[in-house]
Amino acid sequence: MWPLSHRHLCLAFLLVCVLSAISFFLHIYQDSIRHGLGLSILCPDRLVTAPVAIFCLPDSPMSPNTSSPCPQHPASLSGTWTIYPDGRFGNQMGQYATLLALAQLNGRRAFILPAMHATLAPVFRITLPVLAPEVDSSTPWRELQLHDWMSEEYADLGDPFLKLSGFPCSWTFFHHLREQIRSEFTLHDHLREEAQSVLRRLRLGRSGDRPRTFVGVHVRRGDYLQVMPQRWKGVVGNSAYLREAMDWFRARHEAPVFVVTSNGMEWCRENIDASKGDVMFAGDGQEASPWKDFALLTQCNHTIMTIGTFGFWAAYLAGGDTVYLANFTLPDSEFLKIFKPEAAFLPEWVGINADLSPLWTLAEP
């Protein structure tokens, strides 16, 4: 037998190494399958069984169903959009929902400003990140004031750095994302439980029975008592409207109870007929801490609203039937230039016309 050359020895050694490596990786692969271990060099497009090692490459796409340490924004989203937090509680809910919807529609990343976070985060499980003040001040924003209904131009906004403003609160912006919006506006547990505890304690006055159906009633008073007639040639809901709205529910639901909240609770007690034993004045009317009344309304089955974004959002989140005050301004009101009823109230909601006679009286010489 001829002795092996050095070259042959080297080739044999390399072959042994290759075979050993193949055997090792086959063993690892079989073990990973057996124990549910997955390895991915990209953010996965499906859920994987833990434990898992994930290496996210820059700009790698991510499925919305993926639960992983990958970046929260998909690679298709770019730029930075935000919105001025203006107005009170209901206004800022509308601004948040509109920002979220328009940013998604245009493939942009949405951020909220600290003031909006301070208003909404104590009440809801919102998820949009907060824009740091130093980033806000150094960003070359283009500003855009929105009107209160969806328009075609809002679906094709090319600005990477856009700061929105205005008081948008129209379902036409975000209704296609209703479940996502409802998820964003999920109450914190302690607020939901407190509201449900109040409802559990309510009893029908005549029988003492537990109500089967809860109808939340929001009566907007406060500054609207002057603003509506003096600036907008409009009215707020009166006792006749509330009586008709309650009768609408009494005719369609067995043993309902009406849970009244308002920023004018004294007026409600004096003007809403509670003689049937099915009206409960449950709201505290504190405008500085509106979330208690809001939580109560959202835990009801149905809603009676008058005017305003607070009532809109209570009805939108509660679901069920909604009755609203319709045609609450004169036909020549300037308010109708910034407010479109068909964009403000869902088509399935039921409108009851307002009594405009006090406005005709004011208009007389």
Curated annotation (Swiss-Prot):
<keyword id="KW-0333">Golgi apparatus</keyword>
<dbReference type="Pfam" id="PF01531">
    <property type="entry name" value="Glyco_transf_11"/>
</dbReference>
<keyword id="KW-0472">Membrane</keyword>
<dbReference type="GO" id="GO:0008107">
    <property type="term" value="F:galactoside 2-alpha-L-fucosyltransferase activity"/>
</dbReference>
<feature type="glycosylation site" description="N-linked (GlcNAc...) asparagine">
    <location>
        <position position="301"/>
    </location>
</feature>
<dbReference type="GO" id="GO:0006629">
    <property type="term" value="P:lipid metabolic process"/>
</dbReference>
<feature type="glycosylation site" description="N-linked (GlcNAc...) asparagine">
    <location>
        <position position="65"/>
    </location>
</feature>
<feature type="glycosylation site" description="N-linked (GlcNAc...) asparagine">
    <location>
        <position position="327"/>
    </location>
</feature>
<keyword id="KW-0325">Glycoprotein</keyword>
<dbReference type="InterPro" id="IPR002516">
    <property type="entry name" value="Glyco_trans_11"/>
</dbReference>
<keyword id="KW-0808">Transferase</keyword>
<keyword id="KW-0443">Lipid metabolism</keyword>
<protein>
    <recommendedName>
        <fullName>Galactoside alpha-(1,2)-fucosyltransferase 1</fullName>
        <ecNumber>2.4.1.69</ecNumber>
        <ecNumber>2.4.1.344</ecNumber>
    </recommendedName>
</protein>
<keyword id="KW-0328">Glycosyltransferase</keyword>
<feature type="topological domain" description="Cytoplasmic">
    <location>
        <begin position="1"/>
        <end position="8"/>
    </location>
</feature>
<dbReference type="GO" id="GO:0036065">
    <property type="term" value="P:fucosylation"/>
</dbReference>
<dbReference type="GO" id="GO:0021772">
    <property type="term" value="P:olfactory bulb development"/>
</dbReference>
<dbReference type="GO" id="GO:0005975">
    <property type="term" value="P:carbohydrate metabolic process"/>
</dbReference>
<dbReference type="GO" id="GO:1904906">
    <property type="term" value="P:positive regulation of endothelial cell-matrix adhesion via fibronectin"/>
</dbReference>
<comment type="similarity">
    <text>Belongs to the glycosyltransferase 11 family.</text>
</comment>
<comment type="pathway">
    <text>Protein modification; protein glycosylation.</text>
</comment>
<dbReference type="GO" id="GO:1903672">
    <property type="term" value="P:positive regulation of sprouting angiogenesis"/>
</dbReference>
<keyword id="KW-0735">Signal-anchor</keyword>
<feature type="topological domain" description="Lumenal">
    <location>
        <begin position="26"/>
        <end position="365"/>
    </location>
</feature>
<dbReference type="GO" id="GO:0032580">
    <property type="term" value="C:Golgi cisterna membrane"/>
</dbReference>
<keyword id="KW-0812">Transmembrane</keyword>
<dbReference type="GO" id="GO:0030155">
    <property type="term" value="P:regulation of cell adhesion"/>
</dbReference>
<dbReference type="GO" id="GO:0010595">
    <property type="term" value="P:positive regulation of endothelial cell migration"/>
</dbReference>
<feature type="transmembrane region" description="Helical; Signal-anchor for type II membrane protein">
    <location>
        <begin position="9"/>
        <end position="25"/>
    </location>
</feature>
<keyword id="KW-1133">Transmembrane helix</keyword>
<comment type="function">
    <text>Catalyzes the transfer of L-fucose, from a guanosine diphosphate-beta-L-fucose, to the terminal galactose residue of glycoconjugates through an alpha(1,2) linkage leading to H antigen synthesis that is an intermediate substrate in the synthesis of ABO blood group antigens. H antigen is essential for maturation of the glomerular layer of the main olfactory bulb, in cell migration and early cell-cell contacts during tumor associated angiogenesis. Preferentially fucosylates soluble lactose and to a lesser extent fucosylates glycolipids gangliosides GA1 and GM1a.</text>
</comment>
<dbReference type="GO" id="GO:0031127">
    <property type="term" value="F:alpha-(1,2)-fucosyltransferase activity"/>
</dbReference>
<dbReference type="GO" id="GO:0006486">
    <property type="term" value="P:protein glycosylation"/>
</dbReference>
<dbReference type="GO" id="GO:0001954">
    <property type="term" value="P:positive regulation of cell-matrix adhesion"/>
</dbReference>
<dbReference type="GO" id="GO:0001936">
    <property type="term" value="P:regulation of endothelial cell proliferation"/>
</dbReference>
